[in-house]
């Protein structure tokens, strides 16, 4: 069930209006989509942050504006580069019977067998683009890596979608791999040197013993 987020219309996009909205703890935004007029809105900052935290950045939401409900996706958010708080949000109204392209987070589950043997997990992809009906958008794409040995990889093509969505990314792209353990650098070489008689350094003059 989609999370319900209440929104109100805002009169304009003047800087003074936007500033007042933010000072009141709200976030200005816009609602757009096929067959609807763009609407300038604002939502509660705390409510939006909670929705993202609990449902995920790309989850389906119900945006309630007055007596009307819209099924929406949060397509873009702008954050303050220093404080990290949300400054603006773009909501796209979607048709529940039409597939959408959306980025979904990749989550690796478990500890790889190769890690227990000293291998190093390297994750190359943290998001995948999928084509899916809005009601079937997963909160994340979970991949069990517990069986991976050193040298093993997981590619996009290895993911079982269960027929619920299509992955747009190239099937050959590597999502994660288990690298061999880093070899400890040898401190001593195999050659032995007589004490008190270091080898001559290249480019340095030496005086033969008399």
Swiss-Prot record:
Offer a single GO CC term for the protein. Answer: cytosolic large ribosomal subunit
Q: Which residues form a coiled coil?
A: none
Bias type Basic and acidic residues, positions: 185-210
Gene Ontology biological process: translation
Q: Which Gene3D superfamilies match?
A: Ribosomal protein L25, beta domain, Ribosomal Protein L25, Chain P
* Molecular function via GO: 5S rRNA binding; structural constituent of ribosome
Instruction: Spell out the SUPFAM superfamilies in the cross-references.
Output: Ribosomal protein L25-like
Q: Which family does it belong to?
A: Belongs to the bacterial ribosomal protein bL25 family. CTC subfamily.
What PANTHER family does the record tag this protein with? RIBOSOMAL PROTEIN L25/GLN-TRNA SYNTHETASE, ANTI-CODON-BINDING DOMAIN-CONTAINING PROTEIN, RIBOSOMAL PROTEIN L25_GLN-TRNA SYNTHETASE, ANTI-CODON-BINDING DOMAIN-CONTAINING PROTEIN
Outline the subunit composition.
Part of the 50S ribosomal subunit; part of the 5S rRNA/L5/L18/L25 subcomplex. Contacts the 5S rRNA. Binds to the 5S rRNA independently of L5 and L18.
Record-given protein name = Large ribosomal subunit protein bL25
Q: Which organism is it from?
A: Geobacillus sp. (strain WCH70)
